[in-house]
Amino acid sequence: MTDLDQKQLGKTLWNIADTLRGAMNADDFRDYMLSFLFLRYLSDNYEAAVKKELGADFPAAEGREPSGTAEVSSTSPDGSRRAAKSPSAQAGGDDGRTSLSVWYADNPGDVAAFEKQMRRKVHYVVKPDYLWGSIVYLAKSQDGKLLDTLQKGFKFIEEESFSSNFQGLFSEINLGSDKLGRRYDERNAKLCSIISEIARGMALFSTDVDTLGDAYEYLIGQFAAGSGKKAGEFYTPQQISSILSGIVTLDSQEPKTGKRKKLNAVLDFTCGSGSLLLNVRHRMTESGGTIGKIVGMEKNITTYNLCRMNMLLHGVKDTEFEIYHGDTLTNDWDYLREPNPAKKPAFDAVVANPPFSYRWEPGEAMSEDMRFKAHGVAPKSAADFAFLLHGLHYLKDDGVMAIILPHGVLFRGGVEERIRTKLLQDGHIDTVIGLPANLFYSTGIPVCILVLKKCKKPDDVLFINAAEQFVKGKRQNQLTDEHIGRIIETYQYRKQHERYSRRVKMKEIEANDFNLNISRYVSTAEAEEEIDLAATHAELVAIEKSIQKATAKHNEFLKELGLPPLP
Protein backbone atom coordinates (compact mmCIF):
# COMPACT_ATOMS: atom_id res chain seq x y z
CA MET A 1 0.00 0.00 0.00
CA THR A 2 1.28 3.46 -0.86
CA ASP A 3 1.84 6.19 1.72
CA LEU A 4 -1.13 8.02 0.21
CA ASP A 5 -3.37 4.97 0.71
CA GLN A 6 -2.16 4.53 4.28
CA LYS A 7 -2.98 8.14 5.09
CA GLN A 8 -6.34 7.84 3.37
CA LEU A 9 -7.22 4.74 5.42
CA GLY A 10 -6.46 6.67 8.59
CA LYS A 11 -8.61 9.58 7.42
CA THR A 12 -11.45 7.23 6.44
CA LEU A 13 -11.47 5.61 9.87
CA TRP A 14 -11.24 9.00 11.57
CA ASN A 15 -14.24 10.29 9.61
CA ILE A 16 -16.16 7.19 10.68
CA ALA A 17 -15.21 7.83 14.31
CA ASP A 18 -16.14 11.49 14.09
CA THR A 19 -19.52 10.64 12.59
CA LEU A 20 -20.48 7.75 14.85
CA ARG A 21 -19.40 8.91 18.28
CA GLY A 22 -22.22 11.45 18.48
CA ALA A 23 -22.32 12.94 21.97
CA MET A 24 -19.85 10.39 23.34
CA ASN A 25 -16.60 11.75 24.75
CA ALA A 26 -13.78 11.40 22.21
CA ASP A 27 -11.55 9.58 24.72
CA ASP A 28 -14.26 6.99 25.41
CA PHE A 29 -14.98 6.41 21.73
CA ARG A 30 -11.23 6.17 21.05
CA ASP A 31 -10.97 3.11 23.26
CA TYR A 32 -13.78 1.29 21.43
CA MET A 33 -12.52 2.23 17.98
CA LEU A 34 -8.91 1.23 18.62
CA SER A 35 -9.89 -2.02 20.33
CA PHE A 36 -11.94 -3.10 17.32
CA LEU A 37 -9.06 -2.23 15.00
CA PHE A 38 -6.83 -4.32 17.22
CA LEU A 39 -9.26 -7.25 17.13
CA ARG A 40 -9.11 -7.04 13.34
CA TYR A 41 -5.31 -7.30 13.52
CA LEU A 42 -5.40 -10.23 15.97
CA SER A 43 -7.86 -12.07 13.74
CA ASP A 44 -5.88 -11.55 10.53
CA ASN A 45 -2.63 -12.53 12.19
CA TYR A 46 -4.15 -15.58 13.86
CA GLU A 47 -5.91 -16.83 10.73
CA ALA A 48 -2.72 -16.49 8.70
CA ALA A 49 -0.91 -18.60 11.30
CA VAL A 50 -3.77 -21.11 11.34
CA LYS A 51 -3.69 -21.47 7.57
CA LYS A 52 0.04 -22.11 7.71
CA GLU A 53 -0.32 -24.59 10.56
CA LEU A 54 -3.15 -26.60 8.99
CA GLY A 55 -1.74 -26.52 5.48
CA ALA A 56 -3.80 -28.72 3.18
CA ASP A 57 -6.29 -29.38 5.99
CA PHE A 58 -7.37 -25.75 6.05
CA PRO A 59 -10.91 -25.57 4.60
CA ALA A 60 -10.69 -23.99 1.18
CA ALA A 61 -14.28 -24.27 0.03
CA GLU A 62 -15.33 -21.57 -2.41
CA GLY A 63 -16.37 -18.41 -0.62
CA ARG A 64 -14.50 -19.31 2.55
CA GLU A 65 -11.41 -17.22 3.14
CA PRO A 66 -9.77 -15.95 6.30
CA SER A 67 -11.47 -12.84 7.64
CA GLY A 68 -10.04 -9.93 5.80
CA THR A 69 -8.49 -11.56 2.74
CA ALA A 70 -11.21 -11.41 0.12
CA GLU A 71 -10.53 -9.48 -3.04
CA VAL A 72 -12.80 -6.56 -3.82
CA SER A 73 -12.53 -3.99 -6.53
CA SER A 74 -11.97 -0.41 -5.47
CA THR A 75 -10.90 2.88 -6.90
CA SER A 76 -7.48 4.18 -5.98
CA PRO A 77 -6.85 7.91 -5.48
CA ASP A 78 -5.56 8.25 -9.03
CA GLY A 79 -8.82 6.91 -10.43
CA SER A 80 -7.53 3.48 -11.45
CA ARG A 81 -9.19 0.26 -10.35
CA ARG A 82 -7.36 -2.08 -8.06
CA ALA A 83 -7.91 -5.22 -6.07
CA ALA A 84 -7.88 -4.77 -2.34
CA LYS A 85 -8.06 -7.11 0.59
CA SER A 86 -11.40 -6.67 2.25
CA PRO A 87 -12.51 -7.59 5.73
CA SER A 88 -15.98 -8.21 4.43
CA ALA A 89 -14.86 -11.70 3.49
CA GLN A 90 -15.01 -11.98 7.19
CA ALA A 91 -17.34 -14.87 6.89
CA GLY A 92 -16.70 -18.08 5.13
CA GLY A 93 -20.00 -18.09 3.32
CA ASP A 94 -23.58 -16.85 3.45
CA ASP A 95 -24.07 -18.52 6.83
CA GLY A 96 -21.38 -16.29 8.36
CA ARG A 97 -19.03 -19.12 9.20
CA THR A 98 -15.29 -18.59 8.78
CA SER A 99 -13.00 -21.26 7.41
CA LEU A 100 -11.74 -21.88 10.92
CA SER A 101 -15.26 -22.46 12.24
CA VAL A 102 -15.72 -25.08 9.52
CA TRP A 103 -12.52 -26.83 10.61
CA TYR A 104 -13.63 -26.73 14.28
CA ALA A 105 -16.96 -28.32 13.36
CA ASP A 106 -15.29 -31.04 11.30
CA ASN A 107 -12.55 -31.83 13.84
CA PRO A 108 -13.97 -31.48 17.38
CA GLY A 109 -11.57 -34.05 18.82
CA ASP A 110 -8.50 -32.14 17.62
CA VAL A 111 -9.46 -28.66 18.83
CA ALA A 112 -7.78 -28.81 22.27
CA ALA A 113 -4.44 -30.01 20.87
CA PHE A 114 -4.66 -27.50 18.03
CA GLU A 115 -5.24 -24.55 20.38
CA LYS A 116 -2.38 -25.70 22.59
CA GLN A 117 -0.11 -25.69 19.55
CA MET A 118 -1.28 -22.22 18.50
CA ARG A 119 -0.61 -20.84 21.99
CA ARG A 120 2.94 -22.09 21.69
CA LYS A 121 3.41 -20.58 18.25
CA VAL A 122 1.56 -17.24 18.30
CA HIS A 123 0.98 -17.00 22.07
CA TYR A 124 -2.75 -16.45 21.84
CA VAL A 125 -5.94 -18.10 20.57
CA VAL A 126 -9.06 -16.64 18.98
CA LYS A 127 -12.07 -18.93 18.83
CA PRO A 128 -13.88 -18.90 15.47
CA ASP A 129 -16.90 -17.10 16.94
CA TYR A 130 -14.64 -14.28 18.16
CA LEU A 131 -12.77 -13.64 14.92
CA TRP A 132 -13.26 -10.24 13.35
CA GLY A 133 -15.04 -11.86 10.41
CA SER A 134 -17.62 -13.49 12.65
CA ILE A 135 -18.09 -10.29 14.64
CA VAL A 136 -18.65 -8.24 11.48
CA TYR A 137 -21.18 -10.79 10.24
CA LEU A 138 -23.15 -10.38 13.48
CA ALA A 139 -22.89 -6.59 13.20
CA LYS A 140 -24.10 -6.43 9.60
CA SER A 141 -27.01 -8.73 10.33
CA GLN A 142 -27.90 -6.68 13.44
CA ASP A 143 -27.67 -9.85 15.51
CA GLY A 144 -28.70 -9.36 19.13
CA LYS A 145 -25.85 -11.61 20.26
CA LEU A 146 -23.10 -9.23 19.12
CA LEU A 147 -22.47 -7.47 22.44
CA ASP A 148 -22.47 -10.71 24.42
CA THR A 149 -20.17 -12.36 21.87
CA LEU A 150 -17.72 -9.46 22.02
CA GLN A 151 -17.60 -9.57 25.81
CA LYS A 152 -16.91 -13.29 25.79
CA GLY A 153 -14.36 -12.91 23.01
CA PHE A 154 -12.34 -10.20 24.75
CA LYS A 155 -12.36 -12.19 27.99
CA PHE A 156 -11.28 -15.37 26.21
CA ILE A 157 -8.35 -13.69 24.43
CA GLU A 158 -7.16 -12.17 27.72
CA GLU A 159 -7.51 -15.26 29.89
CA GLU A 160 -6.67 -18.06 27.49
CA SER A 161 -3.56 -16.56 25.91
CA PHE A 162 -0.07 -17.80 26.68
CA SER A 163 1.69 -14.43 26.87
CA SER A 164 1.29 -12.03 29.79
CA ASN A 165 1.13 -9.21 27.24
CA PHE A 166 -2.49 -10.18 26.61
CA GLN A 167 -3.59 -10.18 30.24
CA GLY A 168 -6.11 -7.42 30.94
CA LEU A 169 -5.70 -6.05 27.43
CA PHE A 170 -9.39 -5.15 27.09
CA SER A 171 -9.99 -4.46 30.80
CA GLU A 172 -10.91 -0.81 30.22
CA ILE A 173 -13.33 -1.51 27.38
CA ASN A 174 -16.75 -1.32 29.01
CA LEU A 175 -19.20 -2.79 26.54
CA GLY A 176 -21.95 -2.44 29.14
CA SER A 177 -21.48 1.30 29.49
CA ASP A 178 -24.49 3.60 29.42
CA LYS A 179 -22.47 5.73 27.01
CA LEU A 180 -23.31 3.16 24.35
CA GLY A 181 -26.96 3.08 25.37
CA ARG A 182 -29.15 2.60 28.40
CA ARG A 183 -30.56 -0.78 27.42
CA TYR A 184 -28.81 -3.87 26.10
CA ASP A 185 -30.52 -3.62 22.73
CA GLU A 186 -29.45 0.04 22.37
CA ARG A 187 -25.85 -0.81 23.19
CA ASN A 188 -25.93 -3.78 20.84
CA ALA A 189 -27.34 -1.64 18.01
CA LYS A 190 -24.68 1.04 18.58
CA LEU A 191 -21.91 -1.54 18.42
CA CYS A 192 -23.43 -3.02 15.26
CA SER A 193 -23.25 0.41 13.62
CA ILE A 194 -19.69 1.10 14.72
CA ILE A 195 -18.31 -2.27 13.63
CA SER A 196 -20.21 -2.31 10.33
CA GLU A 197 -18.88 1.13 9.42
CA ILE A 198 -15.31 0.21 10.35
CA ALA A 199 -15.55 -2.90 8.18
CA ARG A 200 -17.04 -0.89 5.31
CA GLY A 201 -14.29 1.72 5.51
CA MET A 202 -11.50 -0.83 5.64
CA ALA A 203 -12.92 -2.84 2.76
CA LEU A 204 -11.49 -0.29 0.32
CA PHE A 205 -7.92 -0.84 1.40
CA SER A 206 -5.31 -3.55 1.61
CA THR A 207 -4.67 -3.95 5.32
CA ASP A 208 -1.38 -5.63 6.11
CA VAL A 209 0.22 -5.31 9.54
CA ASP A 210 2.16 -2.13 8.73
CA THR A 211 -0.96 -0.49 7.33
CA LEU A 212 -3.08 -1.31 10.37
CA GLY A 213 -0.28 -0.07 12.61
CA ASP A 214 -0.05 3.22 10.73
CA ALA A 215 -3.83 3.64 10.81
CA TYR A 216 -3.83 2.97 14.56
CA GLU A 217 -1.08 5.56 15.07
CA TYR A 218 -2.93 8.08 12.90
CA LEU A 219 -6.10 7.64 14.94
CA ILE A 220 -4.20 8.04 18.21
CA GLY A 221 -2.81 11.31 16.88
CA GLN A 222 -6.24 12.54 15.79
CA PHE A 223 -7.84 11.65 19.11
CA ALA A 224 -4.92 13.37 20.86
CA ALA A 225 -5.54 16.52 18.82
CA GLY A 226 -9.09 16.60 20.10
CA SER A 227 -8.22 15.80 23.70
CA GLY A 228 -6.44 19.06 24.56
CA LYS A 229 -4.50 18.86 27.80
CA LYS A 230 -5.29 15.16 28.25
CA ALA A 231 -3.32 14.36 25.09
CA GLY A 232 -0.03 14.84 26.92
CA GLU A 233 -0.84 11.76 28.97
CA PHE A 234 -0.57 9.38 26.07
CA TYR A 235 0.91 10.92 22.93
CA THR A 236 4.16 12.52 21.82
CA PRO A 237 3.77 14.28 18.44
CA GLN A 238 5.64 12.45 15.69
CA GLN A 239 7.71 15.51 14.79
CA ILE A 240 9.20 15.59 18.30
CA SER A 241 9.53 11.81 18.49
CA SER A 242 11.55 11.96 15.29
CA ILE A 243 14.11 14.29 16.88
CA LEU A 244 14.59 12.09 19.94
CA SER A 245 14.78 8.89 17.93
CA GLY A 246 17.19 10.49 15.46
CA ILE A 247 19.52 11.38 18.33
CA VAL A 248 19.50 8.13 20.32
CA THR A 249 20.00 5.92 17.26
CA LEU A 250 23.30 7.62 16.40
CA ASP A 251 26.51 6.26 17.87
CA SER A 252 26.40 7.46 21.47
CA GLN A 253 30.08 8.39 21.83
CA GLU A 254 30.90 9.36 18.24
CA PRO A 255 27.62 10.53 16.65
CA LYS A 256 29.45 11.78 13.56
CA THR A 257 30.26 8.16 12.64
CA GLY A 258 26.57 7.55 11.96
CA LYS A 259 23.82 5.24 13.15
CA ARG A 260 24.23 2.34 15.49
CA LYS A 261 23.77 -1.15 14.11
CA LYS A 262 21.99 -2.43 17.19
CA LEU A 263 20.30 -1.25 20.35
CA ASN A 264 20.22 -4.13 22.81
CA ALA A 265 17.52 -2.42 24.84
CA VAL A 266 15.62 0.88 24.79
CA LEU A 267 13.55 2.33 27.65
CA ASP A 268 10.73 4.86 27.84
CA PHE A 269 9.65 5.13 31.48
CA THR A 270 6.56 7.27 30.70
CA CYS A 271 5.71 5.56 27.44
CA GLY A 272 2.07 6.59 26.93
CA SER A 273 0.72 4.87 23.82
CA GLY A 274 4.23 3.82 22.78
CA SER A 275 4.60 6.17 19.80
CA LEU A 276 8.06 7.34 20.89
CA LEU A 277 9.38 3.80 21.34
CA LEU A 278 7.96 2.78 17.97
CA ASN A 279 9.62 5.79 16.36
CA VAL A 280 12.98 4.61 17.72
CA ARG A 281 12.29 1.14 16.35
CA HIS A 282 11.38 2.57 12.95
CA ARG A 283 14.60 4.62 12.84
CA MET A 284 16.65 1.53 13.56
CA THR A 285 14.96 -0.83 11.14
CA GLU A 286 14.82 1.60 8.21
CA SER A 287 18.61 1.79 8.28
CA GLY A 288 19.04 -1.97 8.62
CA GLY A 289 19.61 -1.93 12.38
CA THR A 290 17.93 -3.99 15.08
CA ILE A 291 16.54 -3.60 18.60
CA GLY A 292 16.84 -6.42 21.09
CA LYS A 293 14.20 -5.36 23.64
CA ILE A 294 11.68 -2.54 23.92
CA VAL A 295 10.82 -1.66 27.52
CA GLY A 296 8.19 0.80 28.70
CA MET A 297 6.37 1.87 31.84
CA GLU A 298 3.01 3.62 32.01
CA LYS A 299 0.91 4.68 34.99
CA ASN A 300 -2.46 5.13 33.27
CA ILE A 301 -4.17 1.74 32.80
CA THR A 302 -6.07 2.74 29.65
CA THR A 303 -2.96 4.17 28.02
CA TYR A 304 -0.98 1.12 29.11
CA ASN A 305 -3.41 -1.09 27.21
CA LEU A 306 -3.25 1.19 24.16
CA CYS A 307 0.53 0.88 24.21
CA ARG A 308 0.49 -2.92 24.23
CA MET A 309 -1.98 -2.96 21.35
CA ASN A 310 0.13 -0.42 19.47
CA MET A 311 3.23 -2.59 19.80
CA LEU A 312 1.50 -5.69 18.48
CA LEU A 313 -0.23 -3.77 15.68
CA HIS A 314 3.17 -2.58 14.45
CA GLY A 315 4.43 -6.13 14.17
CA VAL A 316 6.50 -6.11 17.38
CA LYS A 317 6.44 -9.67 18.69
CA ASP A 318 5.24 -10.10 22.25
CA THR A 319 8.68 -11.54 23.09
CA GLU A 320 10.35 -8.33 21.88
CA PHE A 321 8.70 -5.86 24.23
CA GLU A 322 7.74 -5.53 27.86
CA ILE A 323 5.39 -2.80 29.00
CA TYR A 324 4.67 -2.47 32.72
CA HIS A 325 1.71 -0.79 34.38
CA GLY A 326 3.12 1.17 37.28
CA ASP A 327 4.43 4.41 38.75
CA THR A 328 7.87 5.51 37.59
CA LEU A 329 8.47 7.90 40.49
CA THR A 330 7.84 5.28 43.16
CA ASN A 331 9.62 2.73 40.96
CA ASP A 332 7.25 -0.10 41.80
CA TRP A 333 8.44 -2.47 39.06
CA ASP A 334 10.45 -5.31 40.59
CA TYR A 335 12.40 -5.68 37.35
CA LEU A 336 13.91 -2.22 37.87
CA ARG A 337 14.32 -2.56 41.64
CA GLU A 338 17.07 -5.16 41.37
CA PRO A 339 19.14 -4.69 44.56
CA ASN A 340 22.29 -6.21 43.08
CA PRO A 341 24.10 -3.44 41.11
CA ALA A 342 25.70 -6.06 38.89
CA LYS A 343 22.26 -7.25 37.78
CA LYS A 344 20.61 -3.84 37.48
CA PRO A 345 18.90 -3.41 34.10
CA ALA A 346 20.74 -0.98 31.84
CA PHE A 347 19.72 0.47 28.49
CA ASP A 348 21.59 1.62 25.39
CA ALA A 349 18.98 4.31 24.81
CA VAL A 350 16.49 6.06 27.06
CA VAL A 351 13.78 8.35 25.67
CA ALA A 352 11.02 10.09 27.58
CA ASN A 353 8.31 12.72 27.46
CA PRO A 354 7.26 12.87 31.13
CA PRO A 355 4.45 15.11 32.43
CA PHE A 356 5.79 18.65 32.78
CA SER A 357 6.35 20.06 36.30
CA TYR A 358 4.35 17.23 37.83
CA ARG A 359 3.55 17.63 41.55
CA TRP A 360 4.60 14.62 43.61
CA GLU A 361 5.07 13.58 47.23
CA PRO A 362 8.58 12.23 47.80
CA GLY A 363 8.93 10.64 51.23
CA GLU A 364 11.99 10.86 53.45
CA ALA A 365 13.20 7.51 52.14
CA MET A 366 13.60 9.01 48.66
CA SER A 367 16.88 10.65 49.72
CA GLU A 368 18.35 7.15 50.04
CA ASP A 369 16.90 5.95 46.74
CA MET A 370 19.78 4.90 44.49
CA ARG A 371 18.33 6.97 41.65
CA PHE A 372 18.56 10.22 43.60
CA LYS A 373 21.23 9.65 46.23
CA ALA A 374 24.10 11.20 44.26
CA HIS A 375 22.25 14.27 42.98
CA GLY A 376 19.34 15.03 45.27
CA VAL A 377 15.56 14.71 45.30
CA ALA A 378 13.47 16.94 43.06
CA PRO A 379 11.09 19.35 44.84
CA LYS A 380 7.44 18.51 45.41
CA SER A 381 6.38 21.28 43.05
CA ALA A 382 8.11 19.79 40.00
CA ALA A 383 9.21 16.18 39.45
CA ASP A 384 11.08 17.02 36.23
CA PHE A 385 14.51 16.17 37.63
CA ALA A 386 13.14 13.07 39.36
CA PHE A 387 12.12 11.70 35.96
CA LEU A 388 15.46 12.70 34.47
CA LEU A 389 17.49 11.04 37.24
CA HIS A 390 15.37 7.90 36.99
CA GLY A 391 16.27 7.54 33.32
CA LEU A 392 19.93 8.40 33.87
CA HIS A 393 20.16 5.75 36.59
CA TYR A 394 19.25 3.00 34.11
CA LEU A 395 21.37 4.32 31.25
CA LYS A 396 24.40 2.28 30.23
CA ASP A 397 27.82 3.90 30.63
CA ASP A 398 28.05 4.16 26.84
CA GLY A 399 24.36 4.91 26.31
CA VAL A 400 22.49 8.09 25.40
CA MET A 401 19.33 9.59 26.83
CA ALA A 402 17.03 12.21 25.28
CA ILE A 403 14.25 13.65 27.41
CA ILE A 404 11.67 16.40 26.80
CA LEU A 405 11.33 18.88 29.66
CA PRO A 406 10.02 22.40 30.33
CA HIS A 407 12.55 25.23 30.20
CA GLY A 408 12.34 25.68 33.97
CA VAL A 409 14.86 22.88 34.54
CA LEU A 410 17.47 25.05 32.82
CA PHE A 411 17.40 27.92 35.30
CA ARG A 412 15.24 27.27 38.38
CA GLY A 413 17.01 27.68 41.70
CA GLY A 414 16.99 25.79 44.99
CA VAL A 415 17.40 22.03 44.94
CA GLU A 416 16.95 21.99 41.16
CA GLU A 417 19.96 24.28 40.80
CA ARG A 418 22.02 21.89 42.92
CA ILE A 419 20.93 18.89 40.83
CA ARG A 420 21.67 20.73 37.58
CA THR A 421 25.09 21.84 38.86
CA LYS A 422 26.01 18.29 39.87
CA LEU A 423 24.92 16.91 36.49
CA LEU A 424 27.08 19.50 34.72
CA GLN A 425 30.10 18.99 36.96
CA ASP A 426 29.89 15.24 36.42
CA GLY A 427 29.81 15.80 32.66
CA HIS A 428 26.39 14.23 32.06
CA ILE A 429 24.66 17.01 30.12
CA ASP A 430 25.77 16.81 26.50
CA THR A 431 23.29 18.94 24.54
CA VAL A 432 20.47 21.40 25.25
CA ILE A 433 17.93 21.90 22.44
CA GLY A 434 15.30 24.65 22.58
CA LEU A 435 12.14 23.93 20.57
CA PRO A 436 9.38 26.28 19.36
CA ALA A 437 6.28 26.95 21.44
CA ASN A 438 2.93 25.29 20.72
CA LEU A 439 4.18 21.98 19.35
CA PHE A 440 2.12 19.87 21.77
CA TYR A 441 -1.61 19.29 21.93
CA SER A 442 -1.49 19.49 25.73
CA THR A 443 0.40 22.76 26.23
CA GLY A 444 1.50 25.83 24.32
CA ILE A 445 4.69 26.41 26.30
CA PRO A 446 8.07 25.99 24.59
CA VAL A 447 10.00 22.92 25.70
CA CYS A 448 13.56 21.71 25.51
CA ILE A 449 15.31 18.42 24.87
CA LEU A 450 18.18 17.46 27.14
CA VAL A 451 20.66 14.90 25.81
CA LEU A 452 22.54 13.13 28.58
CA LYS A 453 25.41 10.67 28.68
CA LYS A 454 27.34 9.06 31.52
CA CYS A 455 30.66 9.17 29.69
CA LYS A 456 30.55 12.03 27.22
CA LYS A 457 33.76 13.06 25.49
CA PRO A 458 33.52 16.82 24.70
CA ASP A 459 34.35 19.21 27.55
CA ASP A 460 31.52 21.50 26.54
CA VAL A 461 27.76 21.64 26.17
CA LEU A 462 26.17 22.07 22.76
CA PHE A 463 23.29 24.56 22.72
CA ILE A 464 20.82 24.48 19.82
CA ASN A 465 18.28 27.30 19.72
CA ALA A 466 15.64 26.06 17.28
CA ALA A 467 12.84 28.11 18.85
CA GLU A 468 12.34 30.23 15.73
CA GLN A 469 12.51 27.36 13.24
CA PHE A 470 8.91 26.26 12.56
CA VAL A 471 5.88 26.61 10.32
CA LYS A 472 2.91 28.27 12.00
CA GLY A 473 -0.23 26.13 11.97
CA LYS A 474 -3.87 26.81 12.82
CA ARG A 475 -3.78 24.88 16.10
CA GLN A 476 -0.21 23.68 16.55
CA ASN A 477 3.05 24.84 15.10
CA GLN A 478 4.80 22.33 12.85
CA LEU A 479 8.38 21.23 12.29
CA THR A 480 9.21 20.27 8.72
CA ASP A 481 11.59 17.47 7.78
CA GLU A 482 14.16 20.18 7.10
CA HIS A 483 13.80 21.60 10.61
CA ILE A 484 14.07 18.15 12.18
CA GLY A 485 17.03 17.19 9.99
CA ARG A 486 18.90 20.38 10.86
CA ILE A 487 18.57 19.74 14.60
CA ILE A 488 19.78 16.15 14.30
CA GLU A 489 22.66 17.07 11.97
CA THR A 490 23.77 19.89 14.26
CA TYR A 491 23.83 17.45 17.19
CA GLN A 492 25.56 14.76 15.14
CA TYR A 493 28.48 16.94 14.01
CA ARG A 494 28.34 19.45 16.91
CA LYS A 495 28.14 22.23 14.36
CA GLN A 496 28.16 25.90 15.32
CA HIS A 497 25.88 28.29 13.42
CA GLU A 498 25.38 31.96 14.14
CA ARG A 499 22.16 32.57 16.07
CA TYR A 500 21.37 28.82 16.02
CA SER A 501 23.97 26.66 17.77
CA ARG A 502 27.11 27.00 19.84
CA ARG A 503 29.50 24.82 21.83
CA VAL A 504 29.98 26.37 25.25
CA LYS A 505 32.92 25.51 27.49
CA MET A 506 32.24 24.52 31.07
CA LYS A 507 34.17 27.55 32.35
CA GLU A 508 31.62 29.89 30.76
CA ILE A 509 28.72 27.87 32.14
CA GLU A 510 30.30 27.92 35.59
CA ALA A 511 30.75 31.69 35.31
CA ASN A 512 26.99 31.88 34.72
CA ASP A 513 26.34 29.91 37.94
CA PHE A 514 25.44 26.80 35.93
CA ASN A 515 22.39 28.51 34.45
CA LEU A 516 21.52 26.81 31.16
CA ASN A 517 19.02 29.34 29.86
CA ILE A 518 19.55 28.94 26.12
CA SER A 519 19.29 32.63 25.25
CA ARG A 520 22.35 33.32 27.44
CA TYR A 521 24.48 31.35 25.03
CA VAL A 522 22.66 31.47 21.69
CA SER A 523 20.55 34.51 20.92
CA THR A 524 18.33 34.49 17.86
CA ALA A 525 18.15 38.30 17.79
CA GLU A 526 19.62 39.98 14.75
CA ALA A 527 22.89 41.72 15.62
CA GLU A 528 22.75 45.50 15.35
CA GLU A 529 24.78 46.87 12.48
CA GLU A 530 27.92 48.66 13.66
CA ILE A 531 28.00 52.33 12.60
CA ASP A 532 31.26 53.97 11.49
CA LEU A 533 30.79 57.34 13.19
CA ALA A 534 33.65 59.11 11.32
CA ALA A 535 32.38 58.00 7.93
CA THR A 536 28.81 58.89 8.82
CA HIS A 537 29.91 62.35 10.02
CA ALA A 538 31.85 62.99 6.79
CA GLU A 539 28.81 61.92 4.76
CA LEU A 540 26.53 64.30 6.67
CA VAL A 541 29.01 67.21 6.22
CA ALA A 542 29.12 66.53 2.47
CA ILE A 543 25.33 66.49 2.30
CA GLU A 544 25.15 69.77 4.21
CA LYS A 545 27.60 71.43 1.80
CA SER A 546 25.60 70.13 -1.16
CA ILE A 547 22.42 71.62 0.32
CA GLN A 548 24.10 74.99 0.90
CA LYS A 549 25.39 75.07 -2.68
CA ALA A 550 21.98 74.19 -4.13
CA THR A 551 20.26 76.82 -1.95
CA ALA A 552 22.67 79.57 -3.09
CA LYS A 553 22.04 78.77 -6.75
CA HIS A 554 18.29 78.65 -6.20
CA ASN A 555 18.37 82.07 -4.51
CA GLU A 556 20.11 83.56 -7.56
CA PHE A 557 17.11 82.52 -9.68
CA LEU A 558 14.70 83.92 -7.12
CA LYS A 559 16.60 87.28 -7.09
CA GLU A 560 16.29 87.56 -10.89
CA LEU A 561 12.54 87.00 -10.54
CA GLY A 562 12.26 89.64 -7.82
CA LEU A 563 11.26 87.06 -5.19
CA PRO A 564 12.58 86.79 -1.62
CA PRO A 565 15.44 84.31 -1.13
CA LEU A 566 15.22 81.06 0.82
CA PRO A 567 16.53 81.30 4.37
Enumerate the language-model features and the residues they cover.
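A conserved structural/catalytic subdomain of Rossmann-like adenosyl-cofactor enzymes
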Residues: 2-4, 328-331, 335-567
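Conserved S-adenosyl-L-methionine
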Residues: 233-352, 357-359, 364-373, 386, ...
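Alpha-helix N-cap/helix-initiation motif
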Residues: 2, 189, 193, 230-233, ...
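Short glycine/serine/threonine-biased micro-segments
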Residues: 8, 230, 270-272, 294, ...
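Non-catalytic, mostly N-terminal accessory regions of nucleic-acid modification and defense proteins
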Residues: 1-253, 319-322, 328, 434-437, ...
